[in-house]
Amino acid sequence: MAKASTSGASRVRKKVKKNVSDGIAHVHASFNNTIITITDRQGNALSWATSGGAGFKGSRKSTPFAAQVAAETAGRVALEYGIKTLEVRIKGPGPGRESSVRALNALGIKISSIADITPVPHNGCRPPKRRRI
């Protein structure tokens, strides 16, 4: 008969909160959604939020207001880690580009720089066909 072990299985590791003063906010603004990830300088994620995760579904996910709400959500969690300054890197052509940066600024986080890192093809893949309405 196997003996039930009492040590080891019941121990739960306490999550350690890092104290980070500056970090990087990665904003991925696609046409359908906006994803905001706040990392430390090494690239370890501290917090993240999406427009869909903020409660918006369908075409409302792709609005600037949805990106603003998502940025506020990610920013509040990052403030608990002690974030004071952020370097913002924006990727994508979506409508949530500017409003997400404004929302982070309104939380009291100092934005040191804004960089557009949208990948531009050197005539790579064929783009989607034009919409006809």
UniProtKB/Swiss-Prot annotation:
InterPro entries: Ribosomal_uS11, Ribosomal_uS11_bac-type, Ribosomal_uS11_CS, Ribosomal_uS11_sf. The keyword RNA-binding applies. One of its GO terms (biological process) is translation. It comes from the Bacteria. The keyword RNA-binding applies. GO terms for molecular function: rRNA binding; structural constituent of ribosome. GO terms for cellular component: ribonucleoprotein complex; ribosome. Part of the 30S ribosomal subunit. Interacts with proteins S7 and S18. Binds to IF-3. Belongs to the universal ribosomal protein uS11 family. Located on the platform of the 30S subunit, it bridges several disparate RNA helices of the 16S rRNA. Forms part of the Shine-Dalgarno cleft in the 70S ribosome. HAMAP family: Ribosomal_uS11. This is Small ribosomal subunit protein uS11. It comes from Bordetella petrii (strain ATCC BAA-461 / DSM 12804 / CCUG 43448).
